[in-house]
Amino acid sequence: MKRIGVLTSGGDSPGMNAAIRAVVR
């Protein structure tokens, strides 16, 4: 979960961010 938070916080790839968000949901 911490990794996901860091990835989302960085916002390096908007596409990946959306995918991660979908997985988290």
From Swiss-Prot:
Enzyme Commission (EC) number: 2.7.1.11
Give cofactor(s), names only.
Answer: Mg(2+)
Instruction: Report TM segments.
Output: none
Annotated Gene Ontology cellular components are:
cytoplasm
Query: Which biological pathway?
Result: Carbohydrate degradation; glycolysis; D-glyceraldehyde 3-phosphate and glycerone phosphate from D-glucose: step 3/4
Quote the record's binding site residues for ATP.
Answer: 11
Q: Which UniProt keywords apply?
A: Allosteric enzyme, ATP-binding, Cytoplasm, Glycolysis, Kinase, Magnesium, Metal-binding, Nucleotide-binding, Transferase
One MF term from GO for this chain? Answer: 6-phosphofructokinase activity
How its function is modulated: the record gives: In contrast with PFK1 this enzyme is not affected by phosphoenolpyruvate.
Instruction: From the UniProt record, list the reaction(s) this protein catalyses.
Output: beta-D-fructose 6-phosphate + ATP = beta-D-fructose 1,6-bisphosphate + ADP + H(+)
One Pfam annotation reads: PFK
Chief location bin: cytoplasm
**Places the protein is found:** Cytoplasm
Q: What Gene3D superfamilies does the record tag this protein with?
A: 3.40.50.450
The answer to whether the entry has keyword Secreted is: no
Q: Which InterPro entries match?
A: Phosphofructokinase_dom, PKF_sf
The yes or no answer to whether the keyword Iron is present is no
Which Cys-Cys disulphide bridges does the record give? none
What does the UniProt function comment say about this protein?
Catalyzes the phosphorylation of D-fructose 6-phosphate to fructose 1,6-bisphosphate by ATP, the first committing step of glycolysis.
By sequence similarity, the record places it as follows:
Belongs to the phosphofructokinase type A (PFKA) family. ATP-dependent PFK group I subfamily. Prokaryotic clade 'B1' sub-subfamily.
Subunit structure of this chain's protein: Homotetramer.
- In Swiss-Prot or TrEMBL terms, this protein is called ATP-dependent 6-phosphofructokinase 2
